[in-house]
Curated annotation (Swiss-Prot):
Organism: Saccharomyces cerevisiae (strain ATCC 204508 / S288c)
Keywords per UniProt: Cytoplasm, Nucleus
Subcellular location, record wording: Cytoplasm; Nucleus
Function: Involved in the regulation of anaerobiotic glycerol metabolism.
Predominant location category: cytoplasm
One GO cellular component, as annotated: nucleus
Name listed for the protein in its UniProt record: Protein YIG1
């Protein structure tokens, strides 16, 4: 019925696909059942690839390795840490509150994103008559209200429904560049100072149609290569890299397509979930299958180099996917539970390697019956920093904060412990949750948006 199936003959994968796509004139489509959605854009030149490689290497160094993956070598010195976590689970968790910031803005109706390097929390309101955009600086622990010189100008720029956002510094640390992807396919870049004053903006992508079909939406943006490049993903154009150093005669900026091909039936899929952590890209398109590419610029990126099959329970739906960067795992949230699914390096993902099976899909946390029937985002929040996963649940008499850690030794997630943050800090309901790291003490730091507009920061001892 149009659902791709995978069989293995003589160690080689053969994929079957819907017959109405078999006449697509593309060698890769004939072989893999995939197609290239962005043939209208030129191929990414090698010189730009080299420039991007340099920028990516520089960003990893500046971020202290948080962008990288967690290896078994990194875990050699963690045996004592695992014993400490077992001790924590026996005696309970201890947190220390290090900041309590109260905002006059009502953030309860706002949606939020964490930017690519976890330096900013981006809040926005999609209300038609009053568009608002705010940044929370994790290091400075304060809010930046984004504003235009003329009243109503920001409402005009943000007039369409926002799907995704990201931000980064400009050519210097005194300017912030904010990327905004819209439902109608528009891609906007705002330049502002550290006080939130927008001094100029660029329309990087302007759809020629006003249609709001789902395949036009910009689903993901990546600001990690600013101020030189922007990475975006949509079902219409696939993964594009837009160069801000190459402006065309008509004023638009040149976009290039990557080598990656996408599943043949992607445009007809209604439950697409995707996450972009350049150069990684992961896509869930339903049918209990995840497509994962470790390096978009790699020579083997002409197909998503990992197909991960798994099974869901009856009436179980995928709500969100995310990365657990330091464990080479994907975090999958459904309406019933949280799952951790491993990905392999390309060298391990050879033709002779078996596909990921259900035995390698690790349940982390089963949602309680009274909460998992509610809408997504009510009563429960989750955040991770790669090593630790934090989950909050609001109950009748308390608000529990549970902590899990992945063990390389045991190949599973271990329960570290929990704390009642309502009894300790008066936090009744958690609207949003973020976890970072405090380098000075090598311990996770949680930033919690509460239902009374407090932004509380607590440290795990």
């Amino acid at each position: 019925m149009g659902i791709p199936m995978q069989i293995y003959q003589d160690g080689k994968g053969v994929q079957f696909y819907h017959t109405r796509y078999q006449n697509v004139f593309d060698e890769r489509a004939s072989k893999y059942g995939n197609y290239t959605v962005n043939n209208d854009y030129p191929q990414l030149p090698d010189t730009i690839k080299e420039h991007i490689d340099q920028l990516t290497f520089s960003n990893v160094g500046e971020d202290g390795g948080d962008v990288g993956n967690y290896s078994e070598e990194d875990d050699d010195g963690d045996e004592e840490k695992e014993l400490e976590d077992v001790f924590r689970s026996n005696r309970g968790l201890e947190f220390v509150r290090i900041n309590n910031y109260f905002t006059t803005h009502d953030l309860q109706s706002f949606k939020s994103f964490r930017n690519f390097n976890s330096k900013y929390w981006i809040f926005y309101s999609n209300q038609a008559e009053d568009k608002k955009l705010l940044l929370y600086d994790f290091n400075g622990q304060h809010l930046i209200f984004i504003k235009q010189q003329f009243y109503g100008q920001l409402n005009l720029l943000l007039s369409d429904a926002i799907i995704c956002m990201d931000c980064n510094f400009g050519y210097n640390s005194n300017t912030i560049q904010i990327l905004v992807g819209f439902q109608n396919g528009k891609l906007l870049k705002l330049n502002c100072d550290l006080n939130g004053n927008v001094n100029n903006h660029l329309l990087l992508k302007d759809p020629s149609t006003s249609s709001h079909q789902s395949h036009l939406s910009i689903l993901n943006v990546w600001a990690g290569l600013l101020p030189h490049f922007v990475v975006s993903f949509s079902l219409k154009d696939g993964l594009l890299i837009t160069s801000l150093d190459h402006q065309q005669s008509n004023g638009s900026f040149q976009s290039f397509h990557t080598n990656i091909d996408l599943p043949v039936d992607l445009r007809t899929t209604t439950n697409v979930k995707s996450v972009l952590n350049f150069p990684q890209f992961t896509l869930y398109k339903g049918n209990d299958m995840i497509f994962h590419c470790k390096n978009l610029l790699g020579s083997d990126a002409s197909t998503l180099n990992k197909e991960i099959n798994f099974m869901l329970k009856i009436d179980e739906d995928v709500q969100k996917i995310d990365y657990l960067l330091k464990t080479n795992h994907i975090l999958l949230e459904t309406n019933m539970r949280y799952l951790s699914i491993p990905t392999r390096d390309p060298i391990e993902n050879s033709n002779s390697s078996p596909p990921v099976s259900d035995s390698e899909v690790y349940p982390i946390f089963y949602k309680t019956q009274e909460l998992h029937v509610h809408a997504s985002g009510t009563g429960r929040q989750i955040a991770n920093n790669g090593k630790y996963i934090f989950i909050t649940e609001q109950h009748l008499y308390g608000t529990a904060l549970s902590v899990y850690k992945y063990s390389i030794s045991f190949k599973r997630w271990l329960f570290v412990g929990y704390s009642d943050i309502r009894a300790k800090y008066g936090i009744r309901s958690v609207k949003d949750l973020f976890v970072g790291n405090c380098p000075s003490v090598n311990s996770p730091v949680l930033t919690i948006l509460t239902d009374d507009n407090n932004i509380q920061t607590i440290l795990l001892k």
